[in-house]
Amino acid sequence: MPVVRIVLLLLFLAVITPGIGAGICNYIKEYKRNVAFHFLAGFLAEWALFQLIAVPAIVMGATLTGLSIVYGILLVLCFIAGSAVKAADRKKTPALKVVREPFSKGEKRLWAIALAGILIQLVLAVVMAFEDGDDAFYVTTSNLSVTWDSMYRLLPYNFGSTSLDFRHCLAPFPIWIAFLSKLSGIHPAVFSHTLMPLILLPLAYCIYGLLGYRLLGKNRKKLPAFLIFAEVLILWGNVSAYTAETFLISRTRQGKALLCAVVVPAMFLLLHILAERLLYDKKAEKSLWLLLSMAVFSAGLGSTMGDFLSPFLLGVFGLCLLFMTKKWRPLLPLFFCMVPGLCYMVLYAVVK
C-alpha cells in the first residue's frame, strides 16, 4: 500500500501536472513544447483549482477526505482534457525535429556549475532542517487536517475545538500539503520539511530560467551564467528571516514562500510575455490571460497578502501598458484577471 501511494504522488507530480500544463500551453506558440513552462502552467492550474474549491469546502465544514476526492476527480478530468488537446494538435500538425546549436565546452561547464548549485541547495534544504516558529501553526494545521479529517476547526496550538478560522482558511496552502500527505501516506511534518523543497525549489528555478531567458534577449548562451548569479544571491540571501531567499531555501512548506519565491516571479514572467505580445504582436493568446488569472488565484492560496499584492501588481502593469500603447482594450481582460484577488480581498476585509 505505501508503494502504491508513492506511485500516485509521482504520477501527480510528474505526469498529471505537466499533462494539464501542456494542454494550456498548446495555444501559446512560443511555449508549445517547453517542458519547464508546462510544469509551471500545470502547477498554477492545480493551485487555482484548489483555491477555488477548498475555500467554499472549508467554510461549509467539509472533510479533507471529501475535498481530496473532489479535487482528485477534477484533476484527472483536467489531465484528460489537456492530453486530448495535445493529441489532437499532434494529429493536425505533426511534430518536427527541432535542430539546436550544440553546446560549447564553456556552456557545458556553466550548466554543470548551475545544476550543481541547484543540487546543493536541494540537499541543504532537505538535510539541514530549519526550525521556525510559524511551523507551530502551518505544519500543525496540515497534521491536524490529516489526523482528524477536518479543516481549520481545531486550534493548532492546543488541539482544542474552535469556530472556523476564517482568516487563515482564505489561504489554504497547508490543506494542499495535507492533500499531498494523504495521497502519499507520508506524515505531514515529514512531507512539509523534506518533500516540499524538492517540489518548489526546482519549480522556482524553472521560473527564474524562463524569466532570465527573456531578460537576456533570448540568448541561450547567457542563461547558465544568469542562473549561477541567481543561485549566489539565494545561497547568501539569508540577511534576515523575512527575505524571499530565506523563504525559498528554508520555509518552502509555508504559503508565504509559495507567494514570494514562486508565484510573484511567475506573474512577472507572464506579464513580460503579455507586454511583448501587446506591444509588438498587438494581440495576446487567451491562454496567457487564463494563466495570469490562475496566478492570481495561486497568490491567494499562498497568503491572504497575495490577494492584495496581485491586483496591485496587475494594476501597475495596466497603467504602464496604457501609457505605452494608448489603448484601453487590453485593460478589460487584465481587470478580469484581477477579479479573484479583489473578491478575496473584500471577503477578508468583511470577515476580519
Regions found by a protein language model. Give the residues of each.
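Membrane-embedded, hydrophobic transmembrane alpha-helices
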Residues: 1-100, 341-349
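Specific aromatic-rich, kink-prone transmembrane helix
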Residues: 16-17, 253-279
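Membrane-interface junctions at the ends of membrane-embedded or membrane-associated helices
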Residues: 24-32, 83-93, 271-290, 322-332
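Membrane-interfacial loop-to-transmembrane alpha-helix junctions, especially the N-terminal start
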Residues: 30-46, 111, 220-227, 284-291, ...
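Membrane-interface alpha helices of multi-pass inner-membrane proteins
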Residues: 58, 287-306
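Transmembrane signal-anchor helices characteristic of membrane glycosylation enzymes that use polyprenol
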Residues: 107-133, 338-349
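Active-site lumenal/periplasmic loops and adjacent helix-entry segments of GT-C-fold
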Residues: 117-233, 243-251, 262
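Perimembrane helix-loop-helix junctions
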Residues: 310-336
